């Protein structure tokens, strides 16, 4: 069957299912795709199609992820589901599947379990902004008080990790019943209620072009008679000729002016998110700019070198280290386009980190990098990737 043309008529939102193993994440994913395709059109996907997730590589790390698409009246959703816990950890830390919001699936029969907690913590660390809860398997719980208790537990757990536990939507249902076409309140109706919650509770994400201009510097040239040209792909925002910009990271922040934007050897009056461009800078010398810095809208981003992060350490099979590392380990941190050496401080209760682990760390870089919470990085040793991480909180 030919792939249908991607119609950009509705705003696009990225979501995913998270939660403990066997609480019904994949069944729910299949149920949403099936129920919504009946109502709004689109393609239904069966449980088996979603469960055997294809392997993908993100930053050299193999991750199994299933992608499902569905529509509501107002939006188009891309939904990710992972078969195993390790896949979730890798996915969320590498940002391979950015989520504008997550659906936390929790079995009403079991209540919150260790991975429920771990996924909520990960969501907090990697900056998933919104969580909606689907209390699954409600058909297996006859006692209304027990349901209330589980709901309370889930809300408390979310509040503990700084999500608005008391206010976020919790939908009660049964993904299995919905998948079977059940017309009761726990079946298809619960899935439609979940779709409404997605539409109303998760705000439409800001498009990359609406953000504050940022371009990671890949290369720098000097063109005689014209000045210095910086090349790279615009990460977000728009740059117009005549605007003043800041060069941020590695050394002291400098102010410069954009006097030209080039793409495919053509002169433009502006460049926008996604464009590979050359930006001509006035009054900036070739040696004042280097790969690893960023060009940015003045005041929009600051250089930092001390932060906490959440990292996943590649296993030996993934080409990672064969041995653990300890406190004060000093690898390179690859941010955007360059490596910066830094030292790792482990949590007090952690003596060492084994390949295949994920852990919260504190990092001190030797040079500052233009940084924001949510920025992804790779950890490398001599050019070889040994881990992936995300900035959780900036210390200074």
UniProtKB/Swiss-Prot annotation:
Pfam families in the record: GTP_EFTU (PF00009), GTP_EFTU_D2 (PF03144), GTP_EFTU_D3 (PF03143)
Subunit description: Monomer.
Protein name per UniProt: Elongation factor Tu
InterPro entries: EF-Tu_GTP-bd, EF-Tu_GTPase, EFTu-like_2, EFTU_2, G_TR_CS, P-loop_NTPase, Small_GTP-bd, T_Tr_GTP-bd_dom
Enzyme Commission designation: 3.6.5.3
Region (G1): 19-26
Keyword GTP-binding found: yes
